[in-house]
Structure formats: structure tokens, C-alpha cells
Amino acid sequence: MKYRYATGAAVLSLCLGAAVVQAQGYYYLPPDAGPEFRFGIGPSFFEDGRFTQFGGPVSSKVDYDTGLAFDAALGWNFNKYVAADFETGFIGAKINNVPGFTSDNSRLYNVPFLFNVTLSCPIPRTNLIPYVGAGVGVADVVFDTDNFNDGVTTVTGSENNVVFAGQIFAGLRFQLTGHLSVDLGYKYFATGDPTFSYPPSPNFDVGFRGARTHSVLAALRFDF
């Protein structure tokens, strides 16, 4: 929650600061500069992972079902070529199989908090705008299970761990109006390795290799 407050405060300060200096006549905003908001949704394909800890070191392949990705971002267009934003959202999938373990309704969720920079290249005399970008920050990773066991020890419930996260992305945006566009984009997202502490003892750790995901998202973007 504190990351969301920090993101909102930072973007609000950025927008208010720009408005004040413009009103005072000290700074002229270039064409196409201003705030923007976007959100997107689509399928997410998790690379096969590794199960690394279950009360001690283990090594098993993790097979994921196709997951879901959603993101929302608020930011600032410096001009028609460069923009920066703060993004959060959701990237999660159900665990299909971990050899040697029973997994009942087990899922891995990632809630990212990222700072992105986007470079756009409008194609002259068209409404098409290709773009590429990258982002860094953290992700709150949640492991949620109804029953995960090795035949001896069982863990249930949800635990979370905050780890480093980053992404790269690219896509093609179509300008519908001066303030509204749609786009189709690809995103590669990766995190550090999360570890979750469960009963029966405070040090019973459940660990995974960090997520490596490929998402295809359809998005709406509003420029103000």
C-alpha cells in the first residue's frame, strides 16, 4: 500500500509543479507535453520456473498455466517522443505441476511497482506510433495455496515477499483522437527470487526462482 501512496504523491507533485511554473510564466510546455494515463490487459505466458526451497534446498521444475496480466500507469509526456510513468498492476498464474510435490489450487501473483521510460516514434502522415520502453522497481510477490506438500509437510494460505523487478516492452499505438489512443504491446517481465516463510516453524521457507513472463496486452491511453 505504501508504494501506491508514494506513486500517487510523486505523480501529483510532478503535475502540480508543471502547472505552477507554467502559470507563473517561467516555463513554456512544448507541444504534446502533459499528463497521461493508460491501462491494459491480456494473457501472460510464464516460462518454466524452478522450485528452490521447501524447508531446505530442493530443485524441481515448475510448470505454470497461462496467466493474466493487467497494468495501469500514470505519467508525463515530455514531448511526442519521450514519456515517463509509474506503473502497477498484476501478473499471475496458477501452478500446473511441480514434480515430487502435490499442488492444490496454488498460484503465484506479482504486483509490480515500476518506474518506466517510453520512447515513441510517430510515423509521419499516419496515426501509427511505434514505441519501446523499459522499467525498474520492485514487485510484491504472493504465493497462495490451498494445499502444497511433499508427502510429509504441508503448507497452506498466502505469504508474500517484496523483490526487485524489471521489464522491457514494445508495441504499436493507434491514435483515435487527439487525446485517446489504443495499442497492442508485448511485455517481458522478470523478478528476483522470492522466499515465503510458513509454519510449522518460523524458518520453514518456500522458495521459487523469480518469474519470467511474456505478456501480450491490449491497452487504452488517455493524454490530457
Question: What role is predicted for each listed range?
Answer:
Residues G49-G56, N96-T102, V142-T153, T195-P202:
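Outer-membrane beta-barrel translocator domains and adjoining extracellular loop/strand segments
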